[in-house]
Amino acid sequence: MNFINEKGDMPIVGFYGPLKIDYESKKGWKTPDYLTDSYFEMIRDAGINLINYTQMDYAKEPAAVRKALLLAEKYQIGIYVADSGLRGNMSHEELRNRMSEYSHYHSFKGIHVVDEPGSPHFGPKDRLLSDFYEIMQKLGAFDDVVANVNLFALHPDWIGVDDNTVWLDRAHYEAYVEEYCKNCRPKMLSADYYIFDAYTVATSRDYFENLEILNHYAQKYQIPFWMYIQLGGQWNDSLKEKETLDYYPQPNEVIWNVNTSLACGAKGIAYFPLLQPYYFAFAPDGEMDFERNGLIKANGEKSQWYACTKKANEQIQAVGNVLMQMTLKQMVAKGYYAEQNLPRATDSYGSLKMMEPEDSSNQYGVLAGCFESGTQEAFYVVNNDVKEAQSVRLKFDNAYEMELLSSECHEIVCAKECRVSLEPGAGILIILKEKQYS
């Protein structure tokens, strides 16, 4: 289905959108009015086309939700509405009547059901997927409504059990993802793995494993998967005053996070958080640190990640429509860290017979997602180094007319070999067109 528009644009999503909130800090800082043109304009200009959660419940704040929908419509941004008035025991007609209160807005794209539910073997014990089977199945029966649930990711170092949660191994995680796909009948799949909270590009094996799992179940159930990208860190759902750490990730790491997700088959990119919740800024002695996270700071200013996010989204806009129509078949990797972190990658696939960084001493290497649609092949090549640019040489089985596509490049070349130059963390899509000779 088309999640954004009839053109089939790739969803570029933000979690935590503008909302109605009144808060005053101990030092007298007050939350601004987020439900204004300026915030939606900033979101649009960054390339975001969908907000999948705003923290507002239509059942409790109908006027504020309607205002958000109206503003989003003005700036051609979609919104998923959270509405606790939608219940699993309602009939199809009752659900349709309830949603008719806001579904007439062009910005209405679906319903936010729940974030990070668990199962008996994975996640929180007090918020189980099974609690949402009925409402998910009933909302899923509407052709024009997406019911949005975001899952946990697999973190092997989290394994353990306490009073509230249970974290087990990959087999249990896969059972959790399968339970969701099988019993909730979703139109899309997503999970949030924030690599830079604990790891680096060099130690990204678990990150790529998560992408592999999501892609597997997305293909099995013939739905797209979306991957979350972290804009900052130091989340603070506990609402406690916290000392500030050094800020992370770096801009090129965000670029890499997006491009590797696309190479691994993601058909949607979701950023967290879009608008920094005010409590994510709580610092000692009543101070507020607005620099920690968010595309937009809680004080209303653009964050240090705004420019790199906009750049990443320009890349998605350039290649997204092609990738949305193609299926990932195999990963190719070359270079020490690329090969270590993608252990099931090969060194060639299909018409791509060789991919080599020109600087063989670069340990980070390069990777490529190998895509097909019918008989057409495409290769999404990514520089796995977030500090240094790389030149990459690719050799194919024959000479082809090739389309080279990125936010900074659109070329048609005819060759058996090509070289592409990639900035740190950057990617390029190579689409094979007509074979020139055998």
Question: Language-model features: where?
Answer:
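Glycan-processing catalytic domains of CAZymes
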Residues: M1-N398, S406-E408, I412-K435
